[in-house]
Amino acid sequence: TGVQTCALPISMGKPLPFPNLEGLLESIKSESNEEIKNFVKKIKPINYKAEGVRVLQREGALAVNDLAAEFAEKGMSGDNLLIALVLKRLLDLQVRDYAMGIVSEENIETMWQMWRHLMKIAPSGYIAPVATLFSAVNYERGDGAMATKSLEKALEDQPNYPLAKLLKRVY
């Protein structure tokens, strides 16, 4: 429940970053980005029946690494083509799971910033993987309210997104 997800961070001595639920929701509100939407449309999806699947998965993992490095260095990215590639490749479970697995104590704040930004600008149909990654990072940081609201955002985008449904049962 909302009370439980708010009480957990407080009980751990972590103050809530937003004065109310509206502030939290405003911080993750979607923002349309037509350039990214157009780039995403132009990137070929992975065809699992054709050859080259691993090459495209590797391309996705490397794009995640490059974007994370850019966020670590600059706190943002202006490379909308790279962002679009990450969004497209996160539809692949291997790439998404890789992205989830690279979060560490050392980079969790960078990854939080990156996933939040991508979740806000992702076009419809591409929000669920990023929102789920953002949710997992928030859960690791002890922010149950943000983790829960991020999962809700993922399920609004794709109501049957398996990882979001699983994490919703976990927390």
Task: Label each residue range with its predicted role.
Residues 1-171:
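Charged, compositionally biased boundary regions
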